[in-house]
């Protein structure tokens, strides 16, 4: 592992440990705080960083990087440009002080989409790997689907309640599907009682009743649904961004809330031509 170093305390500890072990030129990566105020050296720290690095041989800087605060929104473009300018200046100062070239990177997924002139030596594709645009732009295709199957369909007479605490009642004779996914799997309880939908055979069907720990109920009265049919929680027909919008949160939270007990199935795709790659990312 090659650690990021964001403070003098950590830098000194790395130097001390490499000296103790007799290690030389161990690669580290210098983080600069250009406005996020989460972790990082301040721009004015660069001369001292250079001095300490040049006085020892245990560690060597391989890259310098920073993190954008609001690259996903045009309302923060002035601040983003300020961050980019600061990083460009600081990276050049660090290279001049160390007298060798560093790998430079600052763009996250939204930055890759919106600030192409600053791709530098590397970019950091995060949520874009899931086919989700952090800035709401077109071009990325969904690559992940959360799905389950219908366990049972019950015929429920008008006036009966569905689920815990009797929070939902059917106003007509209804067909209710039970699916094995609940809040312990990452399906947020705020989607209960019509707050969310699923897709069954191409049709959107509302969640009815309170979402349980391991299951929830779906109103399929108006859908040609059968036991064993596939149920899409999110995917191509129901984007994860739509779920996050309903919860007034971000897609990251939806995706990272899926619990470890949910089975993951991975597919690989070998691309042999540039045309195939363009087709995958939606380039006309």
Model-derived regions: residue spans:
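Short, glycine/acidic-enriched loop or turn micro-motifs at the edges of active sites
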Residues: 34-36, 70, 111, 213, ...
